[in-house]
């Protein structure tokens, strides 16, 4: 045996000969159960009592109920802005795709104006009109929630 093995063996022998203290009682009580069973009457499982005092989440205090309505309205506003942004991005992508297309060979006299000055319509494109309508809806909704 080496020196370290010998010292471990001697330590084990000394520890085996040491008297047992009251740290781990094994005596049985009057009811036939162990002392530990009396200390933990509901069982000795480690999770016993872990959820004791857990509050119910079914009922919310009135403070949170009032905030919930405001949060719903705020969420609706965000959804409106998101829809408007999607419409705008779609229009920008469509405009970008049109600008990257090579020009078609047309005589100069046959070019159509982008808007008709007689009827005053600046938005002849259906997509531009849709964008303006959605932005107006969002702004009207924003004005309605501000007051």
From Swiss-Prot:
UniProt-annotated location(s): Secreted; Cytoplasmic vesicle, Secretory vesicle lumen; Cell projection, Neuron projection
Claim: Ribonucleoprotein is one of the keywords in the record: no
Entry keywords, A to Z: Amidation, Cell projection, Cleavage on pair of basic residues, Cytoplasmic vesicle, Mast cell degranulation, Secreted, Signal
Glycoprotein in keyword set: no
Range of residues in the leader sequence: 1-23
Residues recorded with modification Methionine amide: 52
GO BP: cellular response to sodium phosphate; mast cell degranulation; negative regulation of voltage-gated potassium channel activity; negative regulation of voltage-gated sodium channel activity; neuropeptide signaling pathway; ossification; positive regulation of behavioral fear response; positive regulation of peptide hormone secretion
Recorded GO MF terms: neuropeptide hormone activity
Residue span(s) of the pro-peptide: 56-147
Region ranges (Disordered): 95-123
Comp. bias (Polar residues): 98-113
Main subcellular location: secreted
A cellular-component GO term for this protein: extracellular space
Role of this protein: Stimulates the release of gastrin and other gastrointestinal hormones. Contributes to the perception of prurient stimuli and to the transmission of itch signals in the spinal cord that promote scratching behavior. Contributes primarily to nonhistaminergic itch sensation. In one study, shown to act in the amygdala as part of an inhibitory network which inhibits memory specifically related to learned fear.
Family to which the UniProt record says this protein belongs: Belongs to the bombesin/neuromedin-B/ranatensin family.
Name of the molecule in the record: Gastrin-releasing peptide
Organism name: Rattus norvegicus (Rat)
Taxonomic lineage from the root: Eukaryota, Metazoa, Chordata, Craniata, Vertebrata
């Amino acid at each position: 045996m080496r020196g370290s093995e010998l010292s471990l063996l001697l330590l084990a022998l000394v520890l085996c000969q040491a008297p047992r203290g009251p740290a781990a009682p094994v005596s049985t009580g009057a009811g036939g159960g162990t002392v530990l069973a009396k200390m933990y009457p509901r069982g000795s499982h480690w999770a016993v009592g872990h959820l004791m005092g857990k509050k119910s989440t079914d009922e919310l205090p009135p403070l949170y109920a009032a905030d919930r309505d405001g949060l719903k309205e705020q969420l609706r506003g965000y959804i409106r802005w998101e829809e408007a942004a999607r419409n705008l991005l779609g229009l920008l992508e469509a405009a970008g795709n049109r600008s990257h297309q090579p020009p078609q060979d047309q005589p100069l006299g046959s070019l159509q104006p982008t808007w008709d000055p007689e009827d005053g319509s600046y938005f002849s494109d259906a997509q531009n009109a849709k964008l303006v309508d959605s932005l107006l809806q969002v702004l009207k909704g924003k004005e309605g929630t501000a007051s």
